[in-house]
Regions:
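Helix-to-loop junction immediately C-terminal to a conserved catalytic motif
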Residues: 69
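Conserved ABC ATPase "signature" region
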Residues: 84-85, 124, 135-153
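A short, proline-enriched helix->beta-strand linker immediately N-terminal to the Walker B motif
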Residues: 176-180
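Catalytic Walker B motif of ABC-type/P-loop ATPase nucleotide-binding domains
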Residues: 182-185
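Short coil-to-helix segment of the ABC ATPase nucleotide-binding domain corresponding to the Q-loop/switch region
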Residues: 115-125
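Conserved ABC ATPase signature
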Residues: 157-161, 165
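Conserved ABC transporter NBD signature motif
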Residues: 77-85
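ABC ATPase NBD coupling module
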Residues: 32-33, 86-102, 134
Length: 307
């Protein structure tokens, strides 16, 4: 890898997704109990895409991110990143994958940077550890810090940086070896709303400038609303996807989101909880095909003859 020549953005291919998860399961064993974190999850992400994963605590979103990062192996299914199946990689292959294919940003800033190194030293360290030339590593570090807006803070240690600045350094560290995939687990979770928006702006800018694929786990609806595609996970499966749209009326631009329920490969459909509560659907429901539509009714709904 030539760090003096940054990777050019790759054109997105609708026929060959960069990330493919099929029927993905992850089961954790805790003493005599088994906890199923992912339950047959299916997901496709295009190369160069910027997307968010949302969901309640325990829904499986951080587990999915750890699997994509090569930090945790799924129990069953397929997980392909760039055409390579993470389930069949050797331990040595996974180390190489984590070093060069993926960058990771944690929520806790203390996990992202070393406190006794300056910002530029933190960024150049992964390059040097991977056998890169120190001179090239230093130039690359300065370039990345400039891209995240910290060119004037490069010689400062993390304890003298604000929380937002520390996360910007963390993003630069994650991109040091020019990975095509950047994963961020609640990167703005410990920041105020204004700083969180600024940090997300950095992620969006890097996605556009470098062509890096970015997957962000977030609880922040304000951040999620700025992303073109948001995937919601519930009970270890993808439940809904929403897409950000922009329309023009000749004078102004309007931003809105189209939300879709996801039907998996076995035909399972997760209906949003608020919908179930509104129509009082609990354990069972009636399905009826009416004029090209499928109606979902409470089990005690009156039965009408179908035409």
């Amino acid at each position: 890898m030539n760090l003096d020549e940054p990777r050019k953005p790759a054109p997105a291919s609708q026929s060959e997704p960069y990330i493919v998860c099929e029927d993905l399961f992850k089961i954790y064993k805790q003493e005599d109990l088994e906890v199923v974190a992912l339950r047959g999850l299916d997901l496709k992400v295009q190369r160069g895409e910027l997307m968010a994963i949302v969901g309640a605590s325990g829904s499986g979103k951080s587990t999915l991110l750890n699997v994509l990062a090569g930090l945790d192996l799924p129990s069953a299914g397929r997980c392909l990143v760039g055409g390579r199946n993470l389930l069949t990689m050797t331990p040595a292959d996974l180390v190489t994958y984590r070093r060069n294919e993926v960058g990771f940003v944690w929520q806790q800033t203390s996990r992202n940077v070393l406190p006794y190194l300056t910002a530029v030293q933190n960024v150049e360290l992964p390059i040097i550890l991977d056998g890169g030339d120190p001179g090239v590593a230093r130039r690359r570090a300065y370039e990345l810090l400039d891209m995240v807006g910290l060119s004037q803070r490069s010689d400062i240690r993390p304890d003298r940086l604000s929380g937002g600045e520390q996360q910007r350094v963390a993003i630069a560290v994650a991109l040091a070896n020019d990975p095509p995939l950047l994963l961020a687990d609640e990167p703005t979770g410990e920041l105020d709303s204004q700083t969180a928006s600024e940090v997300f702006g950095v992620l969006r800018g890097l996605n556009q400038e470098l062509g890096v694929t970015v997957v962000v786990v977030t609880h922040d609806p304000a951040i999620a609303n700025q992303i073109d595609r948001v995937v919601a996970i519930r009970d270890g499966r993808i439940s809904t996807e929403s897409f950000r749209r922009v329309s023009f009326d000749g004078r102004e631009a309007y931003v809105y989101h189209d939300e879709y329920a996801v039907v998996d490969r076995t035909g399972r459909l997760q209906i949003p909880k608020e919908y179930l509560e509104r129509v009082d659907i609990q354990e069972r429901a009636r399905l009826r095909l009416v004029e090209g539509m499928v109606e979902v009714l409470p089990e005690d709904a009156p039965v009408e003859d179908e035409e």
